[in-house]
Amino acid sequence: MAKQLDDVVFGGIYEYFRTDNDEIVYRGSTEQDTVEDADNYHRNGHTFTVHLPESKGGRGWKYSWTVFRSNLRRKFGEKLEIGWLEQPREMTREELLVLERERIQEAQALGQCYLNHSDDPLRDWKKFRGK
């Protein structure tokens, strides 16, 4: 069944920060159980079925090699650590995306989160999923 904005999820907000100067370089949300799982997702990629071609039972999506993820795989990535900004709790997926947007925008107002491609995950969800 397709994910919906009104689905109840157990999600939290994480951030990557530089160990050499404490700058926040990226913030995101996850429905993963641990912050380590979210880190592994970004650093190493994954093979979830939603990323398989439709002919093989997936949705045809591909793993996205964003600027952020590419940087994690470079020497620069060794200076980045992940941590919880908002501990996971039960909420709707829409509430999680709104919280993520708020946390990204507050950091960008301070000149941080410069590796976030978008400042509005909810807008992007609606754009790409048509909801």
Regions found by a protein language model. Give the residues of each.
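Short, flexible coil/linker elements and helix-boundary hinge sites characteristic
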Residues: 76-77, 81, 111, 129-130
